[in-house]
């Protein structure tokens, strides 16, 4: 699911592959910027055909699932689907940022910048993090879609 995360800024598809490494702490340095390298490990490289990012009840503020606070979760009821894990996380980040703006009435930066998304694009070449290059197609309701 898309949610804020203490070490990586947000958790999404890129971060989910951390379960395939024996030493997850090795990937938590520098705001989790090495996460994209996991996608090049033989165990997982080229095996993901479709990325699904749940945005059913996103967490938009806080340290992540271990510090859950119901005030910062909302019923978005969305599902993002993409062949590109970087693009899907970019759009998940945009959703979180839009909700934070709506809730706080101003831009409030995440405690940890989600730099792993751009690094996954620029360094590890996993996809695109530039929202201008992402085709975002919305199906269904548009009320309160935020992005």
Put a short name on every predicted segment:
Residues 1-147:
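Extended, low-polarity segments enriched in aliphatic/aromatic residues
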């Amino acid at each position: 699911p898309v949610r804020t995360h203490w070490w990586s800024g947000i958790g999404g598809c890129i971060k989910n592959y951390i379960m395939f490494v024996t030493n997850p702490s090795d990937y938590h340095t520098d705001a989790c910027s090495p996460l994209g390298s996991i996608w090049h490990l033989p165990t997982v490289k080229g095996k993901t055909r479709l990325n699904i990012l749940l945005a059913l009840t996103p967490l938009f503020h806080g340290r992540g699932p271990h510090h859950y606070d119901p005030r910062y979760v909302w019923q978005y009821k969305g599902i993002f689907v993409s062949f590109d894990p970087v693009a899907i996380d970019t759009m998940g980040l945009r959703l979180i940022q839009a909700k934070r703006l709506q809730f706080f009435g101003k831009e409030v930066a995440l405690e940890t910048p989600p730099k792993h998304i751009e690094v996954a694009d620029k360094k590890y070449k996993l996809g695109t993090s530039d929202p201008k290059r992402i085709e975002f197609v919305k199906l269904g309701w548009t009320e309160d879609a935020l992005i």
